[in-house]
Amino acid sequence: MNKKRTPAKRVDIVLLKLVKERSVLYETRKISNLYDAYRLVKNFLVSDREKFVVVCLDTKNQPVSRGTVNSAIVHPREVFKVAVLSNASKIICFHNHPSGNMDFSSEDEEITKRLQKCGEILGIELVDHIVIGDDDKYFSFKENCKI
């Protein structure tokens, strides 16, 4: 019996840490409606580039963290990484349209469906996905029965 030994493979051991970049004071402590959530993120969405912001909530709808995906192309892996590391039970997603037009695109609708599906698998509810336009105008996927 002449068994050939397979060479050993090196496996990386990785430690992930959530590092607080900064904090914001949120006076109402709880997200009771869409406007509460918008007030928490509106300053992060003022940009000439498209930004995607995730608000992570606990079971009492209290914000536990806020994360930003610095890309127009959003992958559920990046969105839920923030949520999982924050021990969130729910998320609300926001993104701006620098053009000021708050109408959603087919890509916006597709990523919303993907986020909802991934959230169901992970046990993290997608509460809403909101597209922000000019002058505090917005499109809510939930209010328009798209979630």
Feature names for model-found ranges:
Residues 98-103:
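Short, solvent-exposed loop/turn segments at secondary-structure junctions
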Residues 97, 131-133:
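Conserved beta-strand edge residues that scaffold enzyme active sites
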Residues 128:
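Beta-strand-loop-alpha "switch" segments that mediate conformational coupling across diverse proteins
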Residues 1-87, 109-118, 122-125, 133-147:
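N-terminal beta-strand/alpha-helix entry module and adjacent surface
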